[in-house]
């Protein structure tokens, strides 16, 4: 009775379980669909839907090709083996039991096994969509490899594809063979009887043909390997490419082995017909022996007994190939080498011919002044500036000025915790801030040429709102009718910034969320029910996400390696992020492989092929084909037509802000450390290696170097140039060994980074590399040695101790710049002082200069240059008009903002009275009078609504009060 009643209960639960499973599957499917559909909306809004569909189309097509190419042969192999099984096979008891277990599942297994392998094969094949599209759209490069005389496009586009196809086909044959053997064994077509193996005729034919196909594929693979020798490392990794033993032993050997493999394949086909296994077994053994003798032993013998005794002379032609290919692949072929016999003598007027360079020496360090930008220009806690700012240039009053720039972005951690605040109210940053790189105020602050809220300065009118930046919120929902309520916080306004201005996004920056379905899609994508439920979202709302400039470029141009350091510029009335994109390969014949960009990737070819811009207001991405000779870029232009614009479409203003990328330069300097010489003997012996010095200003807690010295942007005139150009430079020193470590300069590398300002035409010398080579017997100190000289100089040490005020302030050393001027090498390092308070910021108080073995430590760069060149350098610096304030006891001006204002403008404040050893009462009164005047000016500025003037007056008021307090303490 009990068992009878239980059966209906179990039956009644079955439909419920099935229904639940179906619902769960539908929910999961909809989640997956939501992700795909959100991608479609994002790409479609940006105008790059074709990129996504091409990726998906190629991936899906390759998936089905891979699935069918694996599943069909495996299925056919198993089916043929099963259908040709012996009818009355003699099976042992164990096989009989296996059959009893398998037989009920046989039909399912015969379909499931090929399908499972097909799925894995499809996924693997789809991941090679880039390789396949490159092969289908391959473009000749016009250059040939020196060994086989093939166009380098064969190695860049064809050889990787052929290897992948042969490897995939080999995997298909192996899995098919395993299926044949397993089926034949289970059903008695292959039997082990003692020492004998009995194979039925049908199985023999199938196994032999399958083996023949496999060896035929191995012959093709071995044949292709001879071409791979010119892109593989040789001589124990000393260089990339085919060396003497490769050319004279390995390549001929592989040709022979490929022929033997084909012969073995024919032997297996013959066996399928005649039924004798002896012949292919002997052939297989012969192939193995030949592989050992011809493929391994013979090249080793040639290397050991022919090459090593005469290695330098025999390998010399192949090192020449390696040198030529490496310099071509990394853009070093046209480098101009200039011998530079640097002097260390200082004479009056030595810099007169370099006056244009000294006037452009940047004393503002973008890696240090981030906190100064924050304290002087942040204004509100919900804004922030990055730690490392960027270097750009603008034409001010007819003169191009190097500047340090940053975007005032939102600080996501200070926008409140409510969903409305984080995603509807705090949606964007505000404006670009720029400071002169060559100037400072009298108290060491940056001199801003564009600053404040609302933005004002020398850059003219531009759209200041920054919806897309490096620190933008993960997503924001913006937009609405012009007549509706404005909910997006724009910027602080009113007296003391007590009021706030609101705005509504009016651009086309993200997918519309104008219906319930799209809101549901994005609620699932971002796992936030508020997107679906919020009443503030209307039919004109847009959702902005994936807002990082580098990320946006990487998504619309998936074939690029994207520079991770975009920089902002004001271009044609908009703030835009400029992003560099690189095409790379590891298949350039004979070019040396390196790991410069990503530690896990090896490359031996790189081009800065694309310049991209991302509009900071609406996120629009524009790609420009920059290196029109790059065959990889040409190929991708065929894959994604109409996604890249020609150089002719670049405006003159945008062109003036494009620069040679630092990441590309780092790759080139790393390669040039070895390949600055063109003599094969020097490359072979590694006798003249160079390396980049460590950054003397970046150390770990243990005092050891933390990183290599970065390249620096400067406007300067190098030897070989007829006028100063915006440049990027780096220095070289000998590498340290176990016995020696010489901190002397061996080379100075500079590249012309100025693209010009002509619309649609880059400057003729853009990207021109110049290498100053110093004589080996010169002992020009390198940056690390100069830093040691600064630190050990008694006068410098005493003044630094005064600046540190017994621990109440700290000294921050800025970037140590090296300039080839005055017939030698000039070192310049700004010195900043900041208090130990949480709200302090660095002030530029001193400048260190070195030339040869002489050191100067002065308040301004202009004074330091005169000091080091015996009172008259013959040139002026950008800070020549600065009259620094004199800190009391070396103490004032530490950048503390305790009780200070929201920010400053960078205009030179009225200097407060200087303290004397025993400050008289009139000095205190003068300071109080200055404070009273500044207070009245602040009140007047607020009354007129001039926030910039109010901030300036507020800063002067605070400084005067602080000065009065310090003077009163000395009485």
From Swiss-Prot:
Record's subcellular location: Cell membrane
Keyword Membrane in annotation: yes
Biased composition (Polar residues): 687-702
Native organism taxonomy: Bacteria, Bacillati, Actinomycetota, Actinomycetes, Micrococcales
Family: Belongs to the UPF0182 family.
Membrane topology classification: Multi-pass membrane protein
Compositionally biased region (Low complexity): 884-900, 907-921
Organism per entry: Clavibacter sepedonicus
Protein name per its UniProtKB record: UPF0182 protein CMS1887
């Amino acid at each position: 009775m009990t068992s009878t009643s239980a059966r209906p209960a179990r039956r009644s639960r079955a439909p419920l379980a099935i229904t639940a499973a179906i619902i769960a599957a539908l929910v999961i499917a909809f989640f997956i669909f939501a992700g795909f559909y959100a991608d479609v909306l994002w790409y479609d809004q940006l105008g790059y839907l074709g990129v996504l569909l091409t990726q998906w189309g190629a991936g899906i097509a390759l998936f089905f090709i891979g699935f069918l190419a694996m599943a069909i042969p495996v299925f056919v192999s198993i089916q043929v083996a099963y259908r040709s099984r012996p009818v009355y096979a003699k099976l042992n008891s164990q096989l009989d039991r296996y059959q009893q277990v398998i037989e009920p599942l046989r039909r399912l297994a015969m379909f499931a096994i090929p399908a499972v392998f097909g799925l894995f094969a499809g996924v693997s094949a789809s991941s090679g969509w880039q390789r396949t599209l490159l092969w289908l759209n391959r473009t000749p490069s016009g250059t040939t490899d020196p060994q086989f005389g093939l166009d380098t496009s064969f190695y860049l586009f064809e050889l990787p594809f052929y290897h992948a196809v042969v490897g995939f086909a080999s995997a298909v044959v192996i899995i098919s063979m395993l299926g044949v053997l397993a089926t034949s064994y289970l059903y008695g077509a292959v039997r082990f009887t003692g020492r004998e193996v009995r194979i039925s005729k049908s199985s023999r034919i199938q196994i032999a043909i399958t083996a023949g196909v496999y060896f035929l594929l191995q012959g093709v693979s071995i044949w292709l390997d001879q071409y791979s020798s010119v892109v593989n490392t040789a001589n124990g990794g000393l260089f990339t490419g085919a060396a003497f033993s490769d050319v004279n032993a390995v390549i001929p050997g592989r040709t022979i082995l490929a022929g033997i493999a084909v012969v073995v394949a024919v032997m297996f086909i013959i066996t399928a017909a005649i039924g004798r296994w002896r012949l292919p077994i002997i052939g297989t053994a012969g192939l193995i022996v030949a592989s050992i003798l011809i493929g391994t032993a013979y090249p080793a013998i040639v290397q050991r007994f022919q090459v090593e005794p005469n290695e330098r002379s025999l390998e010399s032609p192949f090192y020449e190939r390696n040198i030529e290919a490496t310099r071509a692949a990394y853009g070093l072929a046209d480098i101009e080498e200039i011998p530079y016999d640097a002097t260390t003598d200082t004479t009056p007027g030595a810099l007169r011919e370099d006056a244009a360079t000294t006037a452009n020496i940047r004393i503002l360090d973008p890696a240090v002044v981030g906190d100064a930008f924050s304290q002087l220009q942040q204004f509100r806690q919900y804004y922030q500036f990055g730690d490392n700012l960027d270097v750009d240039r603008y034409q001010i009053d007819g003169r191009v000025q190097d500047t340090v720039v940053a975007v005032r972005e939102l600080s996501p951690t200070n926008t409140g915790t409510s969903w409305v605040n984080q995603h509807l109210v705090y949606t964007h940053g505000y404006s670009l801030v720029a400071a002169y790189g060559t100037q400072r105020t009298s108290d060491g602050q940056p001199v801003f040429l564009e600053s404040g809220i609302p933005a004002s300065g020398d850059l003219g009118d531009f759209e200041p709102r920054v919806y897309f930046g490096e620190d933008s919120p993960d997503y924001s929902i913006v937009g609405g009718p012009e007549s509706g309520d404005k909910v997006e916080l724009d910027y602080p306004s009113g007296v003391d910034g007590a009021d706030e201005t609101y705005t509504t996004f009016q651009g086309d920056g993200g997918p519309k969320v104008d219906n319930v379905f799209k809101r549901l899609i994005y609620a699932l994508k971002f796992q936030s029910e508020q997107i679906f439920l919020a009443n503030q979202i209307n039919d004109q709302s847009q959702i902005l996400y994936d807002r990082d400039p580098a990320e946006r470029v990487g998504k619309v141009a998936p074939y690029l390696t994207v520079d991770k350091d975009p920089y902002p510029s004001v271009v044609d009335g908009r703030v835009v992020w400029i992003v560099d994109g690189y095409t790379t390969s590891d298949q350039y014949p004979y070019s040396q492989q390196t790991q410069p960009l990503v530690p896990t990737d090896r490359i031996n070819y790189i081009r800065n092929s694309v310049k991209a811009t991302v509009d900071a207001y609406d996120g629009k991405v524009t790609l420009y084909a920059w290196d029109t000779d790059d065959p990889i870029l040409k190929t991708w232009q065929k894959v994604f037509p109409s996604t890249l614009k020609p150089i002719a479409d670049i405006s003159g203003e945008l062109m003036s802000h494009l620069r040679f990328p630092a990441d590309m330069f780092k790759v080139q300097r790393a390669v040039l450390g070895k390949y600055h010489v063109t003599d094969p003997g020097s490359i072979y012996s590694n006798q003249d290696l160079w390396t980049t010095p460590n950054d003397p200003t970046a150390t770990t807690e243990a005092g050891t170097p933390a990183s290599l010295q970065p390249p620096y942007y400067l406007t300067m005139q190098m030897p070989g140039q007829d006028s100063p150009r915006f440049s990027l430079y780096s220095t070289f020193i000998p590498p340290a060994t176990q016995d020696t470590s010489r901190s002397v300069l061996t080379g100075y590398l500079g590249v012309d980074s100025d693209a010009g300002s002509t619309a649609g035409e880059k400057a003729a010398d853009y990207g021109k590399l110049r290498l100053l080579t110093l004589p080996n017997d010169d002992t020009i100190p390198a940056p690390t040695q100069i830093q040691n000289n600064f630190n050990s100089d008694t006068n410098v040490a005493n003044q630094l101790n005064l600046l540190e005020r017994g621990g109440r302030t700290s000294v921050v050393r800025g970037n140590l710049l090296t300039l080839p001027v005055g017939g030698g090498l000039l070192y310049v390092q700004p010195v900043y002082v900041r208090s130990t308070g949480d709200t302090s910021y660095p002030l530029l108080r001193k400048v260190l200069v070195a030339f040869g073995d002489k050191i100067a430590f002065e308040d301004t760069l202009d004074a330091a240059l005169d000091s080091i060149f015996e009172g008259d350098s013959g040139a002026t610096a950008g800070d020549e008009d600065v009259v620094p304030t004199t800190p009391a006891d070396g103490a004032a001006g530490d950048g503390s903002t305790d009780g200070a204002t929201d920010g400053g403008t960078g205009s030179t404040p009225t200097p407060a009275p200087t303290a004397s050893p025993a400050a008289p009462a009139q000095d205190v009164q003068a300071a109080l009078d200055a404070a009273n005047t500044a207070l009245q000016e602040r009140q007047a500025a607020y009354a007129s609504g001039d926030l910039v003037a109010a901030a300036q007056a507020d800063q002067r008021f605070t400084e005067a009060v602080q000065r009065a307090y310090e003077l009163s303490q000395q009485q």
